């Protein structure tokens, strides 16, 4: 199991996955897998990567926003990135796309863009990132909040990989993240404690 901070280089959990424990008290995060885009001593920010918005595809959202798609109707589902600022869109994508002044490199091969440039790129036959997901809203923590949740065994920490992060099989991402840690939901208790 990983510690709060990577002992090798002193980095926080940027670019890692948080996997909700069974029995999480907030139903908005039940069976959720979050990708941490930012994390330092003052705050943390992440996107849920397995919570589709019911019946809303990227193509439909692009149409609503007046973004003309050059590619065959993308059937990717829009994700609910978290409970904060749900009217704001975030595109998590491979780093083969970058928008000057608005793309934030997150971790090896992954970047985040929260401007119209990313939507235009998703709709483009030429500029489209190799892999991407569109999320509305985000999850956020203030100073020490995430660290306390980790001490309280609310989340497991898992290394992210492109296959798990961008896979469209959202329903099974939680169990796949657990499997990557070498466990199943049956191994976990809905109650937390410390030995």
Curated annotation (Swiss-Prot):
InterPro entries: AlgH-like
Superkingdom, natural source: Bacteria
Segments forming a coiled coil: none
One GO CC annotation: cytosol
Family: Belongs to the UPF0301 (AlgH) family.
Protein name: UPF0301 protein CCNA_03506
Species whose genome carries this gene: Caulobacter vibrioides (strain NA1000 / CB15N) (Caulobacter crescentus)
């Amino acid at each position: 199991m990983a510690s709060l901070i990577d002992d090798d280089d002193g980095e926080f959990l940027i670019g890692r996955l948080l996997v909700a424990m069974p029995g999480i008290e907030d139903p908005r995060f039940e069976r959720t897998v979050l990708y941490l885009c930012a994390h330092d001593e003052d705050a943390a920010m992440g996107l849920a990567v397995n919570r589709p918005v019911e019946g809303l595809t990227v193509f439909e959202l692009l149409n609503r926003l007046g973004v003309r798609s050059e590619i065959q109707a993308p059937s990717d589902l829009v994700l609910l990135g978290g409970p904060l600022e749900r009217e704001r869109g975030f595109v998590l994508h491979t780093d083969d796309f970058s928008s000057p002044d608005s793309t934030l490199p997150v971790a090896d091969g992954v970047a985040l863009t929260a401007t119209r440039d990313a939507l235009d790129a998703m709709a483009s036959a030429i500029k489209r990132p190799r892999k991407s997901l569109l999320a509305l809203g985000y999850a956020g923590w203030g100073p020490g909040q995430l660290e306390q949740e980790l001490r309280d065994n609310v989340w497991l920490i898992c290394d992210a990989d492109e296959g798990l992060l961008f896979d469209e099989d959202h329903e099974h991402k939680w169990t796949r993240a657990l499997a990557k840690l070498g466990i199943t939901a049956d191994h976990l208790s809905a109650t937390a404690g410390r030995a």
